[in-house]
């Protein structure tokens, strides 16, 4: 089965999780224009349907986002674009002087089995830090606090124990084991 992503960090994270279930995942590095949608689930589903016309066989994709309570859920489904334009520095700037730092990461995995698309969701609650911390991970990891550490201060294995991506992929891997393998 392919995992379609242009993000090598995501692929490594998911391959490590899949191996614990005895599932082999191959990386299909592919750029694609992500459709716009009002939710991660809608974007993941539309992306999978679009890719199903180009990719033979079964595959999985994942879309994730950072949702900041004080910013009314922003950047949410626009997380990738926002990261490319204003990055972590921009989010920290928007949060200057804001006391409510609550945020969560959400991930939606969309699996295409050759016929239909199924989605699986994972979520992890945390806060936005006051400065960037850590060098591990990617994306918003340096500003997402889980307990007393940012995701970027955690080793991959530690982050994988609690991450939104892990929760979504574990739900998927369990379903796959019960229904397909």
Curated annotation (Swiss-Prot):
One of its GO terms (cellular component) is cytoplasm. GO terms for molecular function: dITP diphosphatase activity; ITP diphosphatase activity; metal ion binding; nucleotide binding; ribonucleoside triphosphate phosphatase activity; XTP diphosphatase activity. One of its GO terms (biological process) is nucleotide metabolic process. It catalyses: XTP + H2O = XMP + diphosphate + H(+); dITP + H2O = dIMP + diphosphate + H(+); ITP + H2O = IMP + diphosphate + H(+). Transmembrane segments: none annotated. Mg(2+) binds at residues 34, 63. Its cofactor is Mg(2+). Substrate binds at residues 5-10, 64, 138-141, 159, 164-165. Binds 1 Mg(2+) ion per subunit. Belongs to the HAM1 NTPase family. Homodimer. This is dITP/XTP pyrophosphatase. The lineage of its organism: Archaea, Methanobacteriati, Methanobacteriota, Archaeoglobi, Archaeoglobales.
């Amino acid at each position: 089965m392919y995992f379609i992503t242009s993000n090598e960090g995501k692929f490594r994270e998911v391959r490590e999780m899949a191996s614990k279930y005895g599932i082999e995942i191959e990386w299909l590095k592919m750029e694609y224009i992500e459709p716009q949608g009002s939710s991660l689930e809608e974007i993941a589903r539309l992306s999978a349907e679009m890719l199903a016309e180009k990719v033979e066989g079964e595959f999985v994709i994942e879309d994730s986002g950072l949702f900041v309570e004080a910013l009314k859920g922003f950047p949410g489904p626009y997380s990738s674009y926002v990261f490319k334009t204003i990055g972590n520095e921009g989010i920290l700037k928007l949060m200057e002087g804001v006391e409510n730092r609550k945020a969560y990461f959400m991930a939606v995995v969309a699996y295409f089995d050759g016929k239909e698309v199924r989605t699986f969701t994972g979520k992890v609650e945390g806060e936005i830090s006051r400065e960037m911390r850590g060098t591990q991970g990617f994306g918003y990891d340096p500003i997402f606090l889980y307990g007393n550490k940012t995701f970027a201060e955690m080793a991959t294995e530690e982050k994988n124990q609690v991450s939104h991506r892990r929760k979504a992929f574990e739900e998927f891997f369990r379903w796959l084991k019960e229904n397909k393998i």
